């Protein structure tokens, strides 16, 4: 399923169709949040069903917001800078996602660390895409 999201994201060039890319990154972020909330509830059971639902919502919507900020910021940065295939656009988008996480947790430290780590991971992802690295390798039989 994640592979399908990445393929849909890569169908259009960077800096175009920002609404579509934001939708895809929001969905991918929400999926990651849903998976992480399932692990959280499995390994640390909630005291009540209401607490479990609240935890799922908190994880899912936070991750979806991070994905939305990444998608919008990356696309707008590519349009403003007029350099659609630059890894710096992805660093800026990842940094915006990290700042969103910091705002959600009310922590400057989380925002700073999230900016650096998410920005670096996103820039490396873009560099790998430009150089032909395989994120989902096909098995060689």
Swiss-Prot record:
One of its GO terms (biological process) is mitochondrial electron transport, NADH to ubiquinone. The chain crosses the membrane at residues 21-43, 58-80. It is found in: Mitochondrion inner membrane. One of its GO terms (cellular component) is mitochondrion. Keywords: Acetylation, Electron transport, Membrane, Mitochondrion, Mitochondrion inner membrane, Respiratory chain, Transmembrane, Transmembrane helix, Transport. It is a multi-pass membrane protein. Accessory subunit of the mitochondrial membrane respiratory chain NADH dehydrogenase (Complex I), that is believed not to be involved in catalysis. Complex I functions in the transfer of electrons from NADH to the respiratory chain. The immediate electron acceptor for the enzyme is believed to be ubiquinone. Complex I is composed of 45 different subunits. Belongs to the complex I NDUFA11 subunit family. This is NADH dehydrogenase [ubiquinone] 1 alpha subcomplex subunit 11. The gene is Ndufa11.
């Amino acid at each position: 399923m994640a592979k399908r999201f990445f393929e849909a994201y890569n169908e259009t060039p960077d800096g175009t169709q920002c609404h579509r890319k934001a939708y895809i990154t929001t969905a991918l972020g929400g999926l990651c949040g849903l998976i992480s909330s399932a692990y959280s509830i499995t390994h640390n059971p909630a005291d009540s069903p209401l607490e479990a639902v609240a935890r799922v919502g908190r994880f899912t919507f936070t991750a979806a917001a991070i994905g939305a900020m990444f998608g919008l910021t990356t696309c707008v940065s590519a349009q403003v800078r007029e350099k659609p295939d630059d890894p710096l656009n992805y660093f800026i988008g990842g940094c915006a996602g990290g700042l969103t996480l910091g705002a959600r947790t009310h922590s400057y430290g989380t925002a700073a660390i999230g900016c650096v780590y998410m920005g670096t991971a996103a820039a490396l992802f873009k560099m790998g895409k430009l150089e032909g690295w395989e994120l989902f390798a096909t098995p060689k039989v």
